[in-house]
Amino acid sequence: MNIFNNHRTKEHLTSTQRNDFSFVSDNDIYLDSACQSLRPQPVLDAMISYFQEYNACGGRVKYQWGKQVDEAVEKTRASVLKRVGKSPKEYEVAFTLNTTYGLNLILNQLPERVYKQLVTSEIEHNSVFLPTMTIAKKLSIPRTILQREEDGSLKYTKDDVSGAIVVVNATSNIDGRTLQNAKVLEDDIHNASGILILDGAQSLVHDSSLLGSVDFDALCFSSHKTYGPSLGVVVVKKQLLDSLELSFVGGGMVEKLDENSFSLPKDDPSCSLEPGLQDFAGIIGLGAALDWLATYRPEGLTQKEHQQKLAHMMFEGLSRLPNIHILNREPSTTLSFYSDDVDAHRLAIFLSKQNIMARSGYFCCHYYLQNVKKYPPLLRLSLGLHNTERDVKTVLTDIEKIIINIK
């Protein structure tokens, strides 16, 4: 079936329209930033510079290239703390494979017989839902799945969080709803001897101010959703880090060692979550991404203004189409929906033929979308700082053509 009469010709937007994404042609409309954001040119440049100019190991050498790596890594740690509004006196920053790995690192090394229950919510990514399942069994404690309100708040009682390991997302990857009662939740958890671990994978580029207002015990997020390379980051309170019973150990973690014991370097606490050689290019790329995020103005607007404008266009445009069911109750840069007229996977394929890249399925949130809500597969449109008004108008036009012609 040929739904479209003609295809867009391949061309490039002007530098003022795409700025640091000039390598993205107008023919390509990428709408999967909730999975992985595109990398702006300064990030690519920083990584190439590392590979070409000082491609060495960090943390273990005395020569100049290695010292440059060490300085760049520490600069990135400082940039992470600044982005989430935390002090190096209270928190450490460690680099891992991804958000999932970071969450597993923390959860699987928590001490036994300290916490009496584990709490998560129904609208969690599998990177939270599965590890909380396995760690509750490992620690022999009950696991409770709580509801989230429409505004993203966690619905709980004080008994629910007493002595609890609470692991929830700060921002949903389905519809962008945020943990509105995060501060009250954190107070209740800490007053009852519990800990709060946040999945911040979707938060760093949208509303990092929420993270700054919450005294979380650990935060895990992904560089690759923050305009950096594929990398995970853990921001952890020193007190929690010191309590971990380490089982993921190896190179770069030794101050002293004998046949049956070892001690960690006193001047590098984060090494307890960083066994082995690190992805130095990735860490340097993340530092460049955070520097870029601090100053980038898409189409002359603030990032928030730009994102809100496109999100409203997308939400209002889809709302006008027939037989479309939008999960979002308000505009968001992450928007999910389904159509009565065309299956989400077919819709994604039709869009792909027009070089529009959108995600279809359940977005690793199977429990909430399939078990709780019993939705059919969904289509998710997630906007990034590279997107333009033209992108949104084109997508809305093409979705309308598909729905009209598929009947």
Indicate where each model-derived feature is located.
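Pyridoxal 5′-phosphate
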Residues: 1-407
